[in-house]
């Protein structure tokens, strides 16, 4: 994976007890944690409180991972449009998830680059672009909360390990807390 980029924005609903990071970002942080499957090294975050109530209503989080993987999350209560989209770019393919799309929620692109080292005196690195097909895998339509509850019940009944265990929840909370600390310090990098 090269990068993970997520946008979760809409107009409201403003919360009175948490900022936009704690309200909207946990979803994308948990997806990021599962997909990247590595522990983030550090986080930076910036945000703004436009209403003057002490709670950020717009925020940008950047997580840094080993091997130069970067993840970016944008959350916002002041957007005129509702966007729920994630892009993941890797060495072989690229994925775009759009939760607002009624029929094509996931698109897989066979696009990418290949770095070619040369002995040429002018250019010592060349970039070759690969453009292939795009396809939309059929994803069964399920209610997310019902699926989660069925999985939880199955783990209890069959004594199996859940997809998202307590450690995954802990990692999400650590990133949320570090993001809040970074926002309060004007984007200071916080080691995890």
Give, region by region, the residue ranges found by the protein language model.
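C-terminal helix-rich "cap/oligomerization" subdomain common to oxidoreductases
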Residues: 137, 146-147, 151-192
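Generic anion/oxyanion-binding catalytic loop in active/binding sites
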Residues: 18-21, 141, 158
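A short, mixed-charge helix-start or loop-turn motif at secondary-structure junctions
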Residues: 14-15, 133-138, 162
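NAD(P)-dinucleotide binding in Rossmann-like oxidoreductases
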Residues: 50-53, 67-147
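A structural signal for well-ordered alpha-helical scaffolds and beta->alpha junctions
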Residues: 25-29, 99-100, 145, 149, ...
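Rossmann-like dinucleotide-binding domain that binds NAD(P)(H)
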Residues: 9-81, 87, 101, 167
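Rossmann-like NAD(P)H-binding beta-loop-alpha module
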Residues: 1-6
């Amino acid at each position: 994976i090269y990068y993970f980029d997520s946008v979760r924005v809409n107009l409201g609903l403003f919360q009175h007890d948490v900022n936009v990071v704690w309200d909207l970002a946990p979803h994308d942080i948990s997806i990021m944690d599962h997909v990247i499957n590595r522990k983030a090294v550090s986080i930076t975050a910036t945000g703004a409180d436009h209403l003057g109530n002490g709670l950020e209503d717009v925020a940008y989080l950047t997580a840094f991972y080993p091997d130069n993987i970067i993840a970016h999350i944008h959350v916002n209560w002041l957007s005129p449009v509702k966007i729920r989209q994630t892009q993941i770019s890797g060495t072989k393919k690229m994925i775009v998830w759009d939760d607002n799309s009624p029929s094509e929620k996931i698109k897989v692109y066979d696009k990418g680059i290949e770095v070619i080292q040369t002995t040429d005196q002018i250019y010592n690195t060349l970039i070759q672009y690969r453009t292939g097909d795009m396809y939309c895998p059929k994803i069964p339509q399920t209610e997310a909360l019902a699926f989660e509850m069925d999985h939880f019940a199955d783990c209890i009944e069959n004594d199996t390990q859940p997809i998202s265990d307590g450690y995954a929840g802990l990692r999400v909370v650590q990133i949320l807390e570090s993001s809040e600390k970074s926002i309060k310090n004007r984007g200071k990098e916080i080691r995890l």
